[in-house]
């Protein structure tokens, strides 16, 4: 049968101590199933959305268990207090201390092996890999930084820019800081953006400031306060924006994906 729908796969918190991803996934699911959200209901008429809320459940559990044990009942925003200083081994890796965001192509870990089976059953047109970076950085989204691998097509590169412009619209409306085309490249083949790209998808990394340092709230160098609520709101916004642009571009996504192969 001819596919007439766009397929979007959203992956959250492959580094388990980047908890805003997993937390925001719940809000994204709520937005999509809310019958009163008419815009989302329209998107779902021509778009299939797959959500992996915790790509690294070992690391996420390790981080959240530690945090619940040390966090104060009244959040302490000072960056040097214990709840902002995650100890070794931390939640970045899985149980075997392997970084799952280096394992997409090699599939040495059981989480990667099982995920890739499902990934190839669906073969999404868009894959977004939602991360966190150092707590005082503004939000990062596509287009990616150079270098691009030579096998990445002009279409894949150009559509990243379209998606980024859609995100920028919402960030500008809310006065949220962001940057593009810096730091996060598309060269190494085993990231959560490059492996999907080499399989015909438009693969992207999104990076929210926070990381394990963020906690429930943290004081920034500019004397502002970054809260978990803020971090979740930003990831939720780019997730929904990704689905929106996919829905508006279904025919092109399907055709370009077909042409790729």
Give the role of each language-model region.
Residues 1-5, 24-28, 41-107, 131-150, ...:
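Surface-exposed loop and adjacent secondary-structure segments within mature catalytic domains
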Residues 5-20:
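Short HxH-centered metal-ligating active-site micro-motif
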Residues 9, 33, 47, 53, ...:
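Hydrophobic, aliphatic-enriched repeat segments that assemble into extended interaction scaffolds
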Residues 12-15, 86-91, 162-170:
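A broad, low-specificity signal for short, low-complexity segments enriched in glycine/proline
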Residues 21-28, 40-43, 47, 96, ...:
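Stable alpha-helical elements in mature extracytoplasmic
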Residues 25-32, 239-242:
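Buried hydrophobic packing segments
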Residues 101, 106-261:
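C-terminal accessory segments enriched in acidic
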